[in-house]
């Protein structure tokens, strides 16, 4: 599942429809621009709590992704704890994968 998640995120990155990093994800959630959030499996407790609370308050689904190092490497970045998805169709695909 994690390979499929990172492949979809890679597509979104190339299309310019993802936000990388906790600060960007929090800002995107506050502005109502995100359709889904992928949180690294090893995200810190504080990060997990902040992002989860904000996503739940905004009605945005959360998807558990691979660890931060893997998530970042697959996106061509240093370790990444959170990725926000702006594209609704991409978000549906990610949430469907999470339900499998």
What are these regions (language model features)?
Residues 51-79:
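Mid-chain, well-packed structural core segment of small domains
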Residues 68-100:
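C-terminal structural segments of small proteins and small subunits
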């Amino acid at each position: 599942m994690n390979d499929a998640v990172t492949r979809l995120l890679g597509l979104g990155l190339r299309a310019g429809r993802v936000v990388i990093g906790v600060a960007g994800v929090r800002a995107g959630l506050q502005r109502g621009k995100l359709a889904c959030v992928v949180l690294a499996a090893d995200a810190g407790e504080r990060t997990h709590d902040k992002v989860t609370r904000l996503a739940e308050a905004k009605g945005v689904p959360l998807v558990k992704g691979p660890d931060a190092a893997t998530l970042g490497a697959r996106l061509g970045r240093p370790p990444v704890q959170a990725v926000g998805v702006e594209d609704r169709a991409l978000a549906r695909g990610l949430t469907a994968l999470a339900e499998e």
